[in-house]
Regions:
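Surface-exposed, low-hydrophobicity beta-strand/loop segments enriched in small/polar/acidic residues
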Residues: 1-144
Length: 144
């Protein structure tokens, strides 16, 4: 699935995308040489969440055109799928995101806590949670 914005101000900013790279709508985005592309699990400086899908069939796929990105603030909450089984005990803990092929949205990996890019702030079901992004935003409660 995807990271779906549920509450907060949802500030959208335009960023130039990396040319010839697929991006899933609702995927976590990071910077690559000044352009945005899908984040990998090692990405700790995140740009936000993609609002638009970029596919190889798009007219601007091979160009570094701009796409809208929701830039998370301390108030923004996102619904996210998990890899593993979520429980109420996950609330308040920090986790990594998955690394997926470009064009496929990431999940929160409940077994991985190396990079800690999200904090679970609410339990929805065994397969979904609410999260806030850590990174370089105010909500982060770890040293950068």
């Amino acid at each position: 699935m995807a990271f779906i914005h549920k509450s907060g101000p949802a500030l959208c900013e335009p960023f130039a995308k990396l040319a010839s790279t697929a991006i899933a709508v609702g995927s976590v985005i990071s910077f690559t040489s000044g352009y945005v592309s899908q984040a990998v699990k090692e990405s700790v400086r995140l740009a936000g969440v993609a609002v638009r899908k970029i596919a190889s069939t798009d007219d601007d796929f091979a160009s570094a055109t701009t796409i809208s990105v929701i830039v998370p603030s301390s108030e923004d909450i996102f619904e996210a799928d998990v890899t593993g089984t979520a429980t109420q005990a996950n609330v308040g803990k920090q986790y990594d995101i998955s690394t997926t092929n470009a064009g496929t949205s990431q999940t929160v990996v409940l077994a991985n806590t190396t990079y800690k890019v999200v904090t679970v702030v609410g339990f929805i079901s065994a397969s979904k949670v609410y999260v806030k992004f850590n990174g370089n935003y105010v909500f982060a409660n770890k040293a950068n």
